[in-house]
């Protein structure tokens, strides 16, 4: 259905599909690792047989990381950053991902900045998450060495009637920077600012290396320092003190 839309089938300068996801969050499936690995091999084979030749990836599936299986080792795993975590965990999770698969891209598949609306429950617009949260999550992922960020969601949408998951409303605004109705606010400004930094320094950032350092008297700070090949230093700070 989409094999001809892959970037590998396009002319230089044309847009196309750059990667294909095999599954979603197998870490939460109550299934033995051997069964997960078997299913991953089947999915991978199905893609290859149907002409998919762009990179194949998984989403939070530990079985892929560091695998020596001849099929699974050709995949790479991505991480998710969930909204209910402390923001500084985004840094340590990316560091863990890079350690477990050092020769693969360090991507965040879902850099979440909101949550869905539920019938009889909280709506996306009632979420406590604001521009500071969106900025902090992105910066901490970058501090950990992330080489790719995918906002989930960047823009809100609307389900066709009855097409949503169980207990979900028709609206899928998700508290996104670009809202379901097209509106923007401080979260959009925060994400736009991150995009401007990446646009200007992305080439240096993705090839930067972590810098070891020692900090005293800053218990409420999460700090990350990265050095680019030309000596440029990128310093990331997150104040975890709720009162300041």
Model-derived segments and spans:
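Carbohydrate-binding surfaces of carbohydrate-active enzymes
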Residues: 1-9, 13-22, 28, 33-53, ...
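Short alpha-helical segments and helix-capping/turn motifs at coil-helix boundaries
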Residues: 3-4, 41-43, 61-64, 85-95, ...
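Structural motif
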Residues: 24, 60, 80-82, 237-240
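Active-site-proximal helices and loops of the catalytic beta/alpha 8
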Residues: 32-94, 187
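Glycoside hydrolase catalytic-domain groove-lining segments
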Residues: 66-120, 137-138, 178
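Alpha-helix boundary/interfacial micro-motifs
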Residues: 68-70, 97, 127, 162, ...
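Short, hinge-like loop/turn segments at secondary-structure boundaries
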Residues: 73-77, 125-126, 167-168
């Amino acid at each position: 259905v989409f094999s001809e839309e892959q970037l590998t089938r396009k002319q230089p300068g044309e847009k196309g599909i750059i990667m294909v996801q095999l599954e979603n969050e197998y870490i939460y499936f109550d299934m033995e690792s051997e069964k997960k690995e078997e299913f991953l091999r089947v999915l991978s084979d199905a893609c290859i047989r149907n002409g998919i030749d762009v990179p194949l990836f998984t989403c939070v599936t530990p079985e892929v990381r560091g695998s020596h299986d001849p099929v699974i080792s050709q995949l790479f795993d991505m991480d998710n950053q969930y909204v209910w975590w402390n923001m500084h965990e985004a840094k340590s999770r990316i560091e863990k991902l890079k350690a477990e698969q050092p020769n693969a891209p360090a991507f965040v598949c879902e850099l979440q900045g909101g949550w869905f609306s539920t019938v009889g429950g909280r709506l996306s617009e009632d979420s406590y998450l604001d521009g500071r949260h969106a900025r902090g999550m992105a910066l901490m992922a970058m501090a950990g060495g992330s080489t790719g960020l995918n906002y989930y969601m960047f823009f809100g949408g609307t389900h066709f009637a009855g097409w949503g998951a169980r207990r979900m409303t028709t609206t899928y605004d998700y508290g996104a920077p670009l809202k379901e109705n097209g509106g923007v606010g401080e979260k959009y400004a925060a994400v736009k600012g991150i995009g401007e930094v990446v646009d200007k320094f992305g080439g240096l950032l993705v090839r930067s290396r972590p810098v070891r350092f020692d900090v005293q008297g800053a218990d409420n700070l999460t700090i990350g320092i990265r050095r680019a090949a030309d000596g440029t230093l990128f310093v990331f700070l997150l104040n975890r003190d709720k009162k300041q």
